[in-house]
C-alpha cells in the first residue's frame, strides 16, 4: 500500500483526478467514504433511485445530485463530472466510451446518484489482519456479475454484481463483524465460499477489475458491489448513462466513522 495515497486528503485526491490521474482508488484516503457513481437522464432517475432503495445491499445511496448541479454535499467544491479517475459512457446499454472527464458529455437533465463503496471499509479490514490482495499486488478488485436478480423498479432491472476478497477461513467472522457495522458501504458479505453458487463459472476471469491469487487454504468472500447499477444499465438499456469506471471511485470528505452502526448483521 502506498502510504502517501493512503494518507492523502480527499480534496487533494479529487484534484489529482480532476487533473487527469487515472488509477483505481483502493487504498486512497484511508478513513474516508468512497462512492460509486451512476448518472441518468431525469426521465429514468426516479426509477433508478427506486431500484437502489429496493436493493440497499448492492446500491446504498449516500447522495443524490439533482439535474443542473454537479457538486456533492459530501465533498465541498467537488464536481462529479471531473473528480472521478475514469468514467464510462453508456449508450442504449452498451459501453460506448471510457473517459477521464465527463464534463463535455454530461447533459443538463442528468441526475447523479452516489452509492457507498466497499473500498471505504478496507482500512478497517487491514487493521484486523485481513489481506487485501488487490491492493498488495497493485491491481483492481475483482468483480463479478451473479445469478442473483435484483428487485426491479419500473424499467430498471438486472443482476447483482459482487466484489471478492480472499482470506483464510479463520478471518471470515472478523470480516463479517467489521463490515456489518457499515451498511451504507455494502455491509457484511453476501456469500462465502463456492463461486458456483453465485453463477460465477471461473473466478479467475472477473467481469470487471482484475483477477487476484487465491492461495491454498483461502476462501473467496463476496460483498455486494456498487457496480450493480452498471449491470442494470446493461440489462435495462436506457438511452444514455454515465458511471464511474469499476474500481475508480469518487472520494468524499465524509469520515467512514460517520456511517458506522452497531454490528448485528451476519450471514
From Swiss-Prot:
Under which EC number(s) is this enzyme classified?
4.2.1.-
Q: Which InterPro entries match?
A: D-Glu_cyclase, Putative_hydro-lyase, UPF0317
Q: State a single Pfam family of this protein.
A: D-Glu_cyclase
Entry keywords, A to Z: Lyase
Q: Which GO terms describe its molecular function?
A: lyase activity
What family, per the record? Belongs to the D-glutamate cyclase family.
| HAMAP family, sorted | Hydro_lyase
Q: What is this protein called?
A: Putative hydro-lyase Arth_3576
